[in-house]
UniProtKB/Swiss-Prot annotation:
The gene is ftsH1. Binds 1 zinc ion per subunit. The chain crosses the membrane at residues 31-51, 127-147. This is ATP-dependent zinc metalloprotease FtsH 1. Its main location: membrane. It is an enzyme of class 3 (hydrolase). Keywords: ATP-binding, Cell inner membrane, Cell membrane, Hydrolase, Membrane, Metal-binding, Metalloprotease, Nucleotide-binding, Protease, Transmembrane, Transmembrane helix, Zinc. SMART domains: AAA (SM00382). It comes from Petrotoga mobilis (strain DSM 10674 / SJ95). Acts as a processive, ATP-dependent zinc metallopeptidase for both cytoplasmic and membrane proteins. Plays a role in the quality control of integral membrane proteins.
Length: 653
């Protein structure tokens, strides 16, 4: 008769309890042996400290002491050993059998005032000597016995070395369920079948259907792959065994394979159950691509995993799940149907998903009424679940730092800035000369972003230093999520990226290091157009990006180039052509709006930060109205008088 679920759980709990009790006994026994050895050494040290080492004198020296009247008392035993106490308190030992026999001489000693006493033993007690001889032997015996026990324990430990290190997930407090997962509704729809199968497998088997043997969750870090697996365990209410891929790989060949077999054995014994392997790429990388024989252990572990996935019966009720953010390096045999035959993409959430995730993470926070989660979701494109959780926590920390009772919208906006660009450098002192350069640089980006039709709206312009190397920033946030980008949009993005350098050229006629990141972005956009997207008329709709050569277990060491040197030169020429033409366009647009650029630069020089709504109003005003709004001619002239060229050593363009 097969065991029911409760019997199996009771059996498993009993085994775990017995294992814990055995560990406690072994630990207690080891402590006792340590105390015994310590006690033996302590007694030996105590005996050695109390050892009476009296000086031994000859018979003639003893007679000399007696004749000189220096003896206070004498103790004599039947063997002729004599203990002499002198009047100055010194104790001597000597040997004189005659004192045992010659009673007359002893009487003469008594007449001289010497106290004479016959005793059984003289000097060092007999058991002291016995202990001194026995203690080293006892210590050696105990030491070797302890070594023997340690070796036995080591043998037992080595027997357990191949045991799986997978942990059984036991939630503390409330279980994680699908209510705690948001922003990935399509993923939850896909994995709902797994929960139904674990709860009622007969429903599937009656129709002749089988569950996929392995389900692979694929997606960028922080999208909720592990959280999804925990939610499945909470919904299905079955044992959930989880391990990291790195837990299986050890120094010794064969250990990882043994752990894989042990994990599947444990799961089968407690079926229905879920096995979840996080970071699968640590153990499931491509075989046979290594530069040497150092990956034998990894390959054996992978082979064992392949056998277990293909070898166990799906009717046992064991579901295998895994997560990775590097599906490109996984072994092809691992992904074939019959193993991890169901792949679920867990991507970044859209704006609606981000709003739902923010609702979950703000449930237990004291949120002010002015907080608009829908607006926050729009302002955080590209954020994944982990980023949003960090954002909410950062906002709560900011509010706490300001001694607020609730987390306000301003705290969330500051948290967005901290997450995107790092904390503000409040105590970094920037000279007026460099501040003026930063003002023109950032306004160069912002003005072009406003003028060009295919760019995202400006959210914030600031010349406050943030993070490691950012002296200022112009943040643009899309109004909605985009999945396709037109060529005209990419070109406009390049123009905006080059706006800072173009503004420096136009106003100061020199270049600064502040445009380094802008140039990298512009170059990446241009290379993508030519090498990967086929957006060049001259080079045609061809994908020129080289194939990645996976030299060592999927790591990208080089890229194989499948075109000639002449073609490579032509590709580089096309990239430069795009960059140069967009730079010229940026310069021309800024020239046409030079007066507005000066006015806005003086405004941000004074205020340091301009938000999107205010920036739109400033750009929509006519020049006279804008000049009056900023503060009039006097304020603008003071800003323009700041001499930058003669005081700052910058490289001319």
């Amino acid at each position: 008769m097969p065991e029911n679920k409760n019997d199996k759980e009771n059996k498993n709990d009993k085994e775990n309890k017995n294992t814990k009790e055995e560990k406690k006994k072994v630990k207690f026994s080891n402590i006792i042996w340590v105390y015994i050895i310590f006690a033996v050494f302590f007694i030996g040290a105590l005996i050695s400290l109390n050892w009476e080492n009296n000086p031994i004198i000859s018979y003639s020296e003893m007679l000399s002491l007696i004749n000189d009247g220096q003896v206070e008392s004498m103790k004599i035993n039947q063997n002729g050993n004599v203990e002499i106490l002198s009047k100055d308190g010194t104790t001597y030992e000597s040997f004189s059998p005659a004192l045992v026999i010659d009673k007359q001489y002893v009487n003469s000693l008594i007449q001289k005032g010497i106290k004479v006493e016959y005793v059984e033993s003289v000097g060092t007690k007999w058991w002291f000597g016995l202990l001194i001889n026995i203690i080293p032997i006892v210590v050696m015996v105990l030491f070797f016995f302890w070594l023997y026990r340690s070796a036995s324990a080591g043998a037992r430990s080595s027997m357990n070395f191949g045991k799986s290190g997978a942990k059984k997930y036991e939630p503390i407090g409330e279980k994680v369920t699908f209510k705690d997962v948001a922003g990935i509704d399509e993923v939850l729809d896909e994995i709902e079948d797994i929960v139904k199968f674990l709860k009622n497998p007969q429903e599937f088997q009656e129709l002749g259907a089988r569950m996929p043997k392995g389900t692979l969750l694929v997606g960028p870090p922080g999208t909720g792959k592990t959280l999804t697996a925990r939610a499945i365990a909470g919904e299905a209410d079955v044992p959930f065994y989880y391990a990291s891929g790195s837990d299986f790989v050890e120094l010794f060949v064969g250990v990882g394979a043994s752990r894989v077999r042990d994990l599947f054995k444990t799961a089968k014994e407690n079926a229905p159950a879920i096995i979840f392997i996080d970071e699968l790429d640590a153990v499931g990388r491509q075989r046979g691509a290594g530069l040497g024989g150092g990956n034998d252990e990894r390959e054996q572990t992978l082979n064992a995993l392949l056998v277990e996935l293909d070898g166990f019966d799906t009717s046992t009720g064991v579901v295998v799940m895994a997560a990775t953010n590097r599906p490109d390096v996984l072994d092809k045999a691992l992904l074939r149907p019959g193993r991890f035959d169901k792949k679920i993409m867990v991507g970044p959430p859209d704006v609606k998903g981000r709003e739902e995730i923010l609702k979950i993470h703000t449930r237990k926070k004291k949120i002010a009424p002015d907080v608009d989660l829908k607006l926050l979701a729009k302002r955080t494109p590209g954020f994944v679940g982990a980023d949003l959780e960090n954002l909410v926590n950062e906002a709560a920390l900011i509010a706490s730092r300001k001694k607020k009772n609730q987390v306000e919208m301003s705290d969330f906006e500051e948290a967005i800035d901290r997450v995107l660009t790092g904390p503000s450098k409040k105590y970094r002192i920037i000279s007026d000369k460099e501040k003026k350069i930063l003002s023109y640089h950032e306004l160069g980006h912002a003005v072009l972003a406003y003028l060009l039709p295919n760019t995202d709206p400006v959210y914030k312009i600031t010349i406050i230093p943030r993070g490691a190397g950012s002296l200022g920033s112009t943040l643009q946030i899309p109004e909605k999520d985009k999945y396709l980008i037109k060529k005209s949009e990419i070109l406009d993005r390049i123009v905006v990226a080059l706006g800072g350098r173009a503004s420096e050229k136009l106003v100061f006629n020199f270049a600064t290091t502040g445009a380094k990141d802008d140039l990298r972005k512009a170059t990446d956009y241009a290379k993508s157009m030519i090498y990967r997207l086929g957006m060049s008329k001259r080079m045609g709709p061809v994908y020129w990006e080289g194939e990645e050569e996976e030299i060592f277990l999927g790591s990208e060491l080089t890229k194989q180039r499948n075109y000639s040197e002449e073609t490579a030169k032509e590709l580089d020429v096309e990239v430069k052509k795009i960059i140069n033409s967009m730079y010229d366009k940026a310069l021309e647009l800024l020239k046409q709006n030079r007066e507005r650029l000066d006015l806005l630069a003086s405004y941000i020089f004074k205020n340091e930060t301009i938000y999107g709504e205010e920036f739109k109003k400033l750009m929509s005003k006519d020049l006279e109205e804008l000049k009056e709004y900023i503060g009039g001619e006097k304020e603008i002239n003071e800003f323009l008088k700041i001499d930058v060229v003669n005081h700052v050593n910058y490289q001319p363009v």
